[in-house]
Each structure stands twice: as structure tokens, then as C-alpha cells.
């Protein structure tokens, strides 16, 4: 069995509307760049290989995006893999979003900056198009999800779904992505969100997204008991903006609420200890006949 490994990715979330809810986000995954991602490392990269930097703007606009892009170019040059290609894809895309805005600004004291920004925008746009074309045939799940989310590429979506049925992932990001693809099938959404929760580490942002998604899915099913249960799990795990008033008009007795809160404590502890599994969840639910 092939297992896709977690390559230390952070997230950029782009929200879309699904019929299951208007709360579950689609994700475009972008890389957390490695050792050379700090400013000092980028300076060294540029000193040693100016070709990685010279077509980019050097003013303060988009500095973080610029540094990430330079690091991604460097990492790809050092070791060209699908993961470094993916990192460059997302870094180029993020830089493009920033530099397009900067290119519209008319600097008062240094008008030449606009020319440089426009040049950087065009250069990186061409680079992005070329890399997107190059990776169209890839079966890397991160790249497939990129093409689906960014360009609504149905073929990429179908291949991503096919891979998820045959292979296991060990990154919750990928299960979250699959859950969003299954937006109209609440049962499959829940299955994949639970798989993602099983893999959670110390990532508050991912924890929030997965649990929000699970609460939303259970609410969509009108399974208010489990929506209430996971709302309390979220509170225990310090997820913000959990609204328990959603349950004031639903038929959950106070006795049942108390039992669910006890179960929530057990589940939250399992998640913290990275011991939450599908089997442990089923066992907890069966103990109270849920």
C-alpha cells in the first residue's frame, strides 16, 4: 500500500460554496518552505545564484511571497521532485496574487517600481503557466488537488478521488481536500474528516477546519447529538467561535447533553494524545448507543 507522507505543509484556504453547507472550505495547499525560507537564507541564495531572483521585484511589496518563491525555486533546482514542483506551483500562485495588486499601484517617488513589478508579474505568470502544463499529468495528490481547486480541472479531481480509494494518506490536509470534493455526499464527507482527525498533530488551524467541517456535516444530517458532541470536543480543544445556541431549539435533553459532554472529553483527550481512531470512535458511540 502506498502512503502519501506529510511534507510539512501549511494551508491557504480558499472558500467555495457546496450544497452540503456554506461553511466547509476548499483548500489549496501551499508548502511550508524549508531551511532557506528565512530572509538571511534568501539573501545567500540570491548572492550565489542571481538567476533565481533577478526577475522579481526587490522593493518591500510582496516581500514574504518573494522570499517563499525564491526558496521554492532553489529547492526545486536542488532536488526536482513532484513535491518541490508542487511547492513552486503554490509559491508562484501566491506571489502572483500579491504582485498583481502591487503592479496596479503608481509609486509617487519611484515610478520605475511599477515597471519592475509589472515585469515580475509577467515573468512569474509565464513560469506558472509552464509549470502547470508540465504537471498536468502528475498523479501526486497535492498537485491534483491544486489543479482541481485552482482551475476546476475535472480530470484532476477524478484522479485524486481514485487515488484516495486505493491508497492511504498520512496528511490530514489530503483527507480534508477529499472531504470537500465529496461536498454533496455527507456520509463520505464525514468518513474523510474523521480520517483527517485521526492524523492530527499539533496544528490548531487544521484542527479547527476539520472539526468545523464535521459539525457542519452532522448538522446537515440533522444528527444534532453528534453535532453537539463535536461542538464540545471543539470547545475542549480551544477551537474558537463554537455556537452552542444552535442546539437550544433542538430536542437534546439535558441528561443526554451531560452524557455527550463526558464523551467529548474522552474524544478530545484521544485527539490530543494522537490516539483517536475510527474504531475508538465507534466504541465510544456504541457505549451510549449513538
List the predicted regions and their residue ranges.
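N-terminal Sec/ER secretory leader and immediately downstream segment
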Residues: 40-143
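Alpha-helical adaptor scaffolds
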Residues: 140-220
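Terminal, low-structured helical/coil segments at or just beyond the last alpha-helical repeat
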Residues: 246-290
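C-terminal motif of bacterial Sec signal peptides marking the signal peptidase cleavage site
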Residues: 32-35
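Conserved positions within tetratricopeptide repeat
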Residues: 190-191, 225-228, 242-245, 257-261, ...
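Boundary/linker segments of alpha-helical solenoid repeat arrays
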Residues: 171-174, 201-210, 236-248, 275-278
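TPR/TPR-like (Sel1-like) alpha-helical repeat modules
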Residues: 222-240, 265-272
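Bacterial N-terminal signal peptides that target proteins for export
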Residues: 4-24
